């Protein structure tokens, strides 16, 4: 019986050990598989195939434009009246060229060929709609000249010369661009003012490149695309997608000394907890930021944690006093990174519709224009829904609003005589021009595969742990009971030469000497002493047979001897 108990105990301990060790083995195997899938260290990795060409997973782009409805009044000093129109939806496709790895395959360098395809079916209207707002062919060059005019007198002279061109001969054509939305956002070829400025090297080409880069040809790409680089996740997976080079710069922008520190948002060091502050390089804001957790979320059944841009990023002082001469609360000033063009980035619609306690866009900025916003529930926040086990972003939405100023323009002619244009306009009057939202999410199929593979293995891991631990504990409990009973028998009858009597039959408490029980002529009484007593002094040999009360079998007592008093003793008289 004690042997049975020991065996059960050993089996139980083995089950407990398996329940403790196997899940960690499964977890390690799962993480290794996920690591192999997400790393970018070779062209054979699954993640690289999507990274290098996202034709199966295009990024969504929604553009909302602020159409100026009172240009004549603005030229006479009136407050701009704007009507928000949209969305104009596009699919963004990226193909990586000039791909290379360092010798250790820890860093991946590339250039993206980016194009946008209009999605008319989901858009509010056609992107051939004519829109009007701030002129991106005029004001950027004016602000450069305004800042460094004495060093670049020729720039001012070329602007004056350009204002004599038929296409720019009126204040309206100088102050406003009136084009199709697609041309305004993505550019058009052969602008006469840019052609004039390009002759002196002030403009890169006669083509207006737009406010969002959309390469029109491979030649355009080769000439204008810049290099990016990121960590591949090898050998340290926690470095996966950490940006090391953005648009040829290792700093947040060319005119900054702050080194890039954060991922591109596609993944973060795993595991991700609610108390974490994942580091992001927000390229559109030229900022390193630490994201803030705001709540749990779910993407097609995959449980995620939602993180947003920190509220402190939008504050003027003291959090961002050193950041590019912040002007107003609620507006990120990226002027230094856009090469002297006054550029503010704000929350879309200045944060309209957000929690009032978090809406601190400076009223002085909002009051510089009147905007009729669309009444819809479209998401305007920038957020990342991060799967905490893998650190991968399952759903991303990134939004910002571009705000640029109108201004009075004064430039010299070839003789050095100054001329003022737009003299009645409100100087440095900031207006929102457009806002855009980029978004991407895992597909329903990918989410289902993730749930099946990752959650399936985790469920198996939990089931093995629970079953193994429960079975192990149960077997150990049974073993303890068996051992306790067995030890009780052993303790009660240790050192005795008799077996446990069968109380239901006195006859069964007798055995025969010299023969098997029931066959010899004289019985031997199994008394409760430490010996076998028999009547008479005859000897029947050295073997005494007794009946085992547990099995019913007749068993020999080896080395049985009889002393002068007629008592037998044996070395194996106790049976348990």
Show where each model-derived region lies.
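Extracellular or lumenal secretory-pathway regions
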Residues: 1-303, 310-518, 545-546
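Non-transmembrane, juxtamembrane loop and terminal tail segments
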Residues: 494-562, 572-575
């Amino acid at each position: 019986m004690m042997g049975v108990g020991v065996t059960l105990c050993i089996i139980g301990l083995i089950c407990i050990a398996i329940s403790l060790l196997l899940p960690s083995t499964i977890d390690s195997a799962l993480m290794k598989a996920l690591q192999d899938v997400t790393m970018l260290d070779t062209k054979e990795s699954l993640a690289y195939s999507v990274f290098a060409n996202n034709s199966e997973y295009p990024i969504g782009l929604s553009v909302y434009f602020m159409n100026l409805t009172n240009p004549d009044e603005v030229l006479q000093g009136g407050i701009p009246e704007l009507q928000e129109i949209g969305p104009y939806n596009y699919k963004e496709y990226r193909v990586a060229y000039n791909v290379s790895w360092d010798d250790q395959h820890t860093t991946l360098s590339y250039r993206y060929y980016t194009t946008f395809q209009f999605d008319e079916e989901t858009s509010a209207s056609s992107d051939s709609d004519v829109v009007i707002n701030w002129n991106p062919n005029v004001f950027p060059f004016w602000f450069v000249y305004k800042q460094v005019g004495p060093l670049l007198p020729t720039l001012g002279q070329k602007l004056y010369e350009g204002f004599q061109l038929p296409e720019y001969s009126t204040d309206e054509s100088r102050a406003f661009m009136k084009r199709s939305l697609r041309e305004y956002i993505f550019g058009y070829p052969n602008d006469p003012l840019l052609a004039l400025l390009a002759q002196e090297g002030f403009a890169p080409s006669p083509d207006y490149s737009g406010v969002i880069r959309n390469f029109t040809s491979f030649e355009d790409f080769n000439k204008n695309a810049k290099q990016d680089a990121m960590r591949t996740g090898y050998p340290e997976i926690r470095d996966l997608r950490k940006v090391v080079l953005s648009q040829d710069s290792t700093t947040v922008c060319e005119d900054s000394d702050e080194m890039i520190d954060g991922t591109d948002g596609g993944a973060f060091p795993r595991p991700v907890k609610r108390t974490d502050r994942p580091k992001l390089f927000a390229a559109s804001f030229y900022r390193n930021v630490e994201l803030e957790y705001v709540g749990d979320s779910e993407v097609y059944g995959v449980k995620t944690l939602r993180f947003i841009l920190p509220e402190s990023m939008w504050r003027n002082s003291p959090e961002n006093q050193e950041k590019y001469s912040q002007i107003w609360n609620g507006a990120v000033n990226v002027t230094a990174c856009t090469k002297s063009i006054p550029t503010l980035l704000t929350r879309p619609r200045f944060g309209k519709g957000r929690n009032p306690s978090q809406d601190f866009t400076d009223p002085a900025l909002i009051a510089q224009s009147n905007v009729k916003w669309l009444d819809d529930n479209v998401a305007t926040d920038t957020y990342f829904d991060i799967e905490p086990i893998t650190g991968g972003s399952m759903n991303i939405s990134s939004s910002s609003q571009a705000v640029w100023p109108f201004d009075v323009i004064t430039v010299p002619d070839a003789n050095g005589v100054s001329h003022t244009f737009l003299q009645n306009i409100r100087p440095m009057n900031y207006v929102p021009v457009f806002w855009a939202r980029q978004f991407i999410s895992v597909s329903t199929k990918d989410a289902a595969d993730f749930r099946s593979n990752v959650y399936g293995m985790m469920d198996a891991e939990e089931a093995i742990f629970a079953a193994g631990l429960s079975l192990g504990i149960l077997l150990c409990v049974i073993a303890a009971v068996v051992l306790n009973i067995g030890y009780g028998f052993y303790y009660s009858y240790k050192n005795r030469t008799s077996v446990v009597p069968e109380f239901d039959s006195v006859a069964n408490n007798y055995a025969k000497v010299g023969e098997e029980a029931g066959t010899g002529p004289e019985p031997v009484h199994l008394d409760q002493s430490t010996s076998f007593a028999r009547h008479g002094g005859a000897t029947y040999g050295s073997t005494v047979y007794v009946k085992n009360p547990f099995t019913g079998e007749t068993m020999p007592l080896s080395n049985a001897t009889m002393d002068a008093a007629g008592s037998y003793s044996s070395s194996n008289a106790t049976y348990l």
